[in-house]
């Protein structure tokens, strides 16, 4: 056969310059440059036909490098924005940064030499903090752009911008004028390590905090009920506390009026008052017998007096709230109005003074008597416990592990301490806030319960901070009376100054310049307050400074999207300020995501060595073999693959799987591109009604798949998109349609109906695949679009709009029929595989398939698909092509199957595999009895002979 012709050049093999390898670290930046040069985002944001869609960015903190949590957050936002752009909305995304606050101030202070710290004025410190925040913002901005995130990067919002600070003062002013801002001496979370008040959102509760808890006896001096009189003078009330250092601030004991309390004998003629329900438990704790001598209702004990064991003062037993329970302790609660929220409320009700003998550093003041100078978090507990022991008042000391608030930045414990602070009176607008929560769509729905309970139960919001790097509270104090001056006129004047000069003006200008003219010579002398605002008030004002201020945006925003910790952070501060100022929520929809953990579900930490750096995923690590450069599309694909409503996992194994999936999608697209290299939809497309049945079935699948993809994006369930697209590329395209269609594409005449009909479906599948993956695999989608071998009216995939699905493609009847055919194919493949494994056949084309189908209607359907003459009919809808075999025979008797060496059966078909009849065709590799019958081409079959003449 040495003279045999070569038919290699007559076969239509796929041709494309689209690279098999992603080469993402090089290709992605090229695509990003194309987007930037062509202003794709800007044009769509301006020219799209539908209304505005505003996802308002929660500002990341301008401190430190980007981590995988940033990537999750920003990419989720970008997926939604790009989907909305493809849907035709005018999407305007303004990225923001949170630039004030303690963490930046601490970073700056840590970076200074001791010589630089001397003479460091607030103005100099603020300048350094400003420069640090801007530098970090620039670095983070470049990182976000490399993630492929689209937005107005040239005009971001920064909370340190003068116009932002002025808008923040406007929010504060509106709240103040409505009576929602007040100054008060109240217990707040105080951080001795940072020497400032903290908001709830600035606290964390690490595992494993252990306190020295004590049970203490306070001797009773006078009784409110005669039932107690017989036990005097040896009667005491027992309390329990996990913070012995707060005992110098004790001014009451609180009880629950509904509970029963008993007098118990502890030893001969010594008695304690405790909750009746706890007697047994306390007997174990004290390791002694407690005998009940009398029992009274809590209400009857009100106004019973006791003497403080360490200070010469009398206090009373008072009625507390439902926080007094029998879950722990004694059922009677030590109450220090200067050291606790509930204590403060009880104290206010009974007119108690607010005693808080602790200074900014956490040291006892002279009011603490013998304990003055001791630090409450270090040596005070030991000294107080010793003093209680000496007085015979200590009943028991034991270690107690519980959740305790720490400063989120210094990682050191905080205390409750009463100080003069500025507050937002949440009580004044709580009901309005709860109504506003009801008007919002929460995703997942559990977010609504979370923020509702937080807002329902929260205390007033302490908004003042004793630090330099922030927006000052625009208040003046009368030098003589210390009365605060806060009027519409003073607020507006400061706001106008900040709008031009920024908040630095507060430190740089004199009081006279900061005051409006009418207050400059009114016979009073003023000083300016030096407190700054809580940074949550900064970011919580962004709805006014950005969404409401920029003409291209809108308020309320369509969506806020952040981590689930923001229910107590930005979601809440934004809600409270917007409701207080305007009576409405600042957002219509709130979507929350969980935190990123490693593959074992552990938090990431340097000590565990399990930190996944997005930069390393994109560009590769030092050792590129161990940590190859995957590009950002792999991170974006990961974001779409996880159920973000819970905490999510990432690690090397997960990334490798995602790279495989990205490559499968890429290679599927590459094959489709190559197969369309000579196709022009305008000239060559086949009308739907003329398509072979398998092609119409494939369009039905395309319609099903992409309808599901749209539903996934609409409901923000991106994991459904991920699963659907992955399944479509592998199961529907690669393993089924592409597999079957190769014969049509390769060996038919280039212009034949048989080939053009298939290319018609390929083009539809490819264009819709590119559009569907564009919100997620943005770079791959654009790469595909740029390599389309035919012209489209669209420069970018993002200009082409969302999926193009014709309702006519949906054909349930056809789908049911082909579902059976695909099942049949699976059964045939099982038997083929056995024959292949036994080396009885090599390729499936070496086989002839025997089918016995007992169901008559199915048998009839199959007969229509088993044309004995391959040159008649539509030359596509045939069983031999479905099974990739050379021949198929429908047998009327199962015995024909039973004699076959390779066979199998299911509940609806029996399959036999035998050797194909005839010779192998040199061109298409099918076996045919016609090979050798054509004088000019003796080594090819009748199909190839016809194809070379342009007839097949």
Swiss-Prot record:
Keyword Transport: no
GO BP annotation list: isoleucyl-tRNA aminoacylation
Cystine pairs: none
Subcellular location: Cytoplasm
Catalytic reaction equation(s): tRNA(Ile) + L-isoleucine + ATP = L-isoleucyl-tRNA(Ile) + AMP + diphosphate
EC number: 6.1.1.5
Cofactor notes: Binds 1 zinc ion per subunit.
'KMSKS' region (motif): residue ranges: 603-607
Keywords assigned: Aminoacyl-tRNA synthetase, ATP-binding, Cytoplasm, Ligase, Metal-binding, Nucleotide-binding, Protein biosynthesis, Zinc
Main location: cytoplasm
Cofactor(s) this protein requires: Zn(2+)
Residues reported in the UniProt entry to bind Zn(2+): 921, 924, 941, 944
Entries under InterPro entries matching the protein: aa-tRNA-synth_I_CS (IPR001412), aa-tRNA-synth_Ia (IPR002300), Anticodon_Ile_BEm (IPR033708), Ile-tRNA-ligase (IPR002301), Ile-tRNA-ligase_type1 (IPR023585), Ile-tRNA_ligase (IPR050081), M/V/L/I-tRNA-synth_anticd-bd (IPR013155), Rossmann-like_a/b/a_fold (IPR014729)
Residues that, per the record, bind ATP: 606
Motif ('HIGH' region): 60-70
GO molecular function annotation: aminoacyl-tRNA deacylase activity; ATP binding; isoleucine-tRNA ligase activity; tRNA binding; zinc ion binding
GO cellular component: cytoplasm
Binding residues annotated for L-isoleucyl-5'-AMP, in chain numbering: 562
Subunit structure and binding partners: Monomer.
UniProt function note: Catalyzes the attachment of isoleucine to tRNA(Ile). As IleRS can inadvertently accommodate and process structurally similar amino acids such as valine, to avoid such errors it has two additional distinct tRNA(Ile)-dependent editing activities. One activity is designated as 'pretransfer' editing and involves the hydrolysis of activated Val-AMP. The other activity is designated 'posttransfer' editing and involves deacylation of mischarged Val-tRNA(Ile).
UniProt similarity note: Belongs to the class-I aminoacyl-tRNA synthetase family. IleS type 1 subfamily.
Description of its domains: IleRS has two distinct active sites: one for aminoacylation and one for editing. The misactivated valine is translocated from the active site to the editing site, which sterically excludes the correctly activated isoleucine. The single editing site contains two valyl binding pockets, one specific for each substrate (Val-AMP or Val-tRNA(Ile)).
Protein name in the entry: Isoleucine--tRNA ligase
